[in-house]
Amino acid sequence: MEGYRLLYPMRTYLVVSGHGDEANVMAADWVTVLSFDPFMVGVAIAPKRTTHKLIKKYNEFVISVPSLEMLRDVWIAGTKKGPSKLKDMGITLVPSRKVKVPSIKEALANIECEVYDTKDYGDHTLFVGKVLAYTYKEEAFEGGKPNLKFNFLAHVSWSEFVTFQDKIYRAE
C-alpha cells in the first residue's frame, strides 16, 4: 500500500495546458485551493508529463471540473500521453476568457490560471496558479455550492471512481 493512498478518495480534475496544436489535457487528483483572496489554486504534476512542459512553456493552465458523464474522457486523459489523445476524447475545447489555454465545454466548471509560482517537492512540481477567471454551469452550483445531482467525480484507485451521494449530513 502506497502511503499517499490513505488520502483517497480525492476529487478528480482535468488540467488543460498549451494551446493550438499543442493543447493537451491530463487527469489530476492533486489539486487544491491555496488562497481565497486572491483566489489561488495549486496542482502537483510530475516533470515527465507533457502537461508539466506546457505549463512551464506558456505559464498558464485551466483546471476543469468533470462529471461522471465525462468518465471516459477522464480515463483517456489519465492513461494516454501527449496531445494526440484529444482525438480519442469526446470533449470540445473552447476559448477561455482570460488565458490562451482553452477550456472544456462539457466541464461543470473551468478555472483559468496564470502561473504565480512553482516549486519542486520530491518527484512533483507544485504549480501555484492565480485565478484570472472562471466559468461554470449555474445548475451545477446552486446557492454557492456544488449540486451533487451533477455527479462530481472522485478517484478511489487506478480505474475506480465514485461520485458524491445526494444525501448531505450536517454536523451540529
From Swiss-Prot:
Cofactor: FMN
Keywords assigned by UniProt, alphabetized: Flavoprotein, FMN
Residue stretches spanning the membrane: none
GO molecular function: FMN binding
Disulfide bonds listed in the record: none
Matching Pfam families: Flavin_Reduct
Keyword Flavoprotein: yes
UniProt cross-references to InterPro entries, sorted A to Z: Flavin_Rdtase-like_dom, Flavoredoxin, Split_barrel_FMN-bd
SUPFAM superfamilies in alphabetical order: FMN-binding split barrel
Family statement drawn from the similarity comment of this UniProt entry: Belongs to the flavoredoxin family.
Record's protein name: Uncharacterized protein PYRAB12460
